């Protein structure tokens, strides 16, 4: 046998190696298929329906159509079309990966709450390196102990005395109302809301507002944030081919964000050093600082690490409240009856302060905001990668009522824009703006605008309060 290999023509060696490699891949695939079949049988799982694709191996047909949707700014309609005519749970192949699409609330509950440790974010967001050089670790990009650490850095988000403090909104809202065009004039309110939110959030995070309402040119950083988000989203979706694309516009936006962050991080580290020096000297250090950056810097002494943590908090959420509030106004402007009910509820409050408790007690105002969340969710999808073989409760079999096997490496995506218009939960008028539906029925996992489970958005109470406060002031 040794002699035979020694006499093997050199030109045949690559063919032999390729054949061995192919056989090894085939053998591994067969072993995995048997293993998954046995697990599915043991766990009572049934097959998931597949959506037809022209390319069932790499899914390049859907990759191309999604790329066009993202570039053409019609991604949400594209998602709706993807689900059209399909069962509530189905599978596709996308860039070679198995992706489970579902709009079952029970699957969302399992994904983010019951079996949440079987699903991760880090393999999707950090593993692909799509966010580099913008940022690496942050509360919305890591799992496990890294996530526990990142969450500890943003503890002020969870403090009631912070998110329930509406007095911090008063001066910025007074300023906004002063500079808005007079009654009767038609204007675009979105830029005003963006600058208002930029002032509100920079005061909370950095301890001082940017004064973007006074100086509109300072909102330049907002446009850079939008470019960073757009580029990062594209890179995440097209990570296998992202090195073939020119990202110079994205890198320029990152440079603006990094300069913005570096200036404030250098300043806070200098303030901490001075603070500690005064303590050692026995001098008065004044009242405790409550801004978020101060708290984060105390727990994270590394500049690059802090910039990453801060960027992944500030940039994705830079205009969350302003977009939500603009959408609420858009709907109320087209529904005079609903607007009249909001105004009546606010005016009945009289001249009393608009406290957190008062705003929570304005049920129709809250219903109007929730109905906007339902129709125009800021968080369009919830996406996780499976890190341990597990199951989801629904989607298997011809009726979709049996469990399904989710294998390590599978991606699960819940499309909330479709789920939140399911007639089963929202009646026969799911496309109609009707806040009363939130007064008629309590909703559970079919409506989780800020996600659910341990990784629920930590700023959910703050966003809801800020939007309610501004709408009430406008009323």
From Swiss-Prot:
Heme binds at residue 457. Disruption phenotype: Does not affect the production of oxopyrrolidines A and B. Its main location: membrane. One of its GO terms (molecular function) is heme binding. Keywords: Heme, Iron, Membrane, Metal-binding, Monooxygenase, Oxidoreductase, Transmembrane, Transmembrane helix. GO terms for cellular component: membrane. It is a single-pass membrane protein. Its EC number is 1.-.-.-. The chain crosses the membrane at residues 10-32. It comes from the Eukaryota. GO terms for biological process: mycotoxin biosynthetic process. The keyword Iron applies. Belongs to the cytochrome P450 family. This is Cytochrome P450 monooxygenase opdE.
